[in-house]
């Protein structure tokens, strides 16, 4: 029925006189003798294709996550720019996207906002920010359950990174004080 994997009984009997219907026949392939250079070239092509597939996967995974907050570890610092290991990818936290007077060491945990993901020749480039106004908004969404549930909405964010920030909030439930819910008991939510 399927000519690529099945043959008729007569052909099978010419190859193996003991063949029975429903049985598997093994057709040995002639040995292929690749030279050292050909084997090395094949290996390089395979490794290159795997790298390309990995880059495509990284780009596909992170392009949909623009605007999210990610956690990572500081891998190294190059010319003031911080290279952050996100687990399955590396991201760049440029010096101008860091909070002033903020200092990182190798191995430090970093929480940052995915600002941009670009497809470039040397692979996808993920750019992070700790000064973006939406970074503060996303942190509040994580920290304040009322914002996460949609009872309180963030209307606007203005900040001077490293010193102060102002967030305009509105409550759609008259019984909930939006500022009090965001500040928390003795400022516990703001301090977090």
Predicted feature residues:
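RNA-contacting regions in translation and RNA-metabolism proteins
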Residues: 1-192
């Amino acid at each position: 029925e399927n000519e690529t994997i099945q043959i008729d009984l007569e052909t099978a009997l010419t190859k193996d006189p003991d063949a029975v219907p429903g049985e598997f026949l093994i057709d040995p392939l002639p040995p292929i003798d690749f030279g050292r250079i050909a084997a090395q070239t094949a290996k390089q092509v395979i490794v290159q294709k795997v790298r390309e597939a990995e880059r495509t996967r990284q780009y596909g995974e992170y392009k949909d996550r623009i605007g999210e907050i990610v956690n990572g570890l500081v891998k190294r610092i190059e010319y003031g720019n911080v290279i952050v290991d996100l687990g399955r990818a590396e991201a760049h936290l440029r010096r101008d996207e860091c909070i002033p007077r903020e200092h990182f060491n190798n191995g430090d945990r970093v929480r940052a906002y995915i600002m941009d993901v670009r497809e470039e020749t040397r692979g996808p480039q993920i750019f992070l920010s700790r000064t973006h106004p939406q970074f503060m908004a996303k942190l509040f969404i994580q920290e304040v359950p009322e914002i996460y549930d949609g009872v309180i909405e963030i209307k606007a964010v203005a900040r001077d990174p490293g010193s102060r920030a102002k967030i305009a909030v509105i409550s759609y439930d008259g019984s909930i004080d939006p500022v009090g819910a965001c500040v928390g008991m003795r400022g516990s939510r703001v301090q977090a």
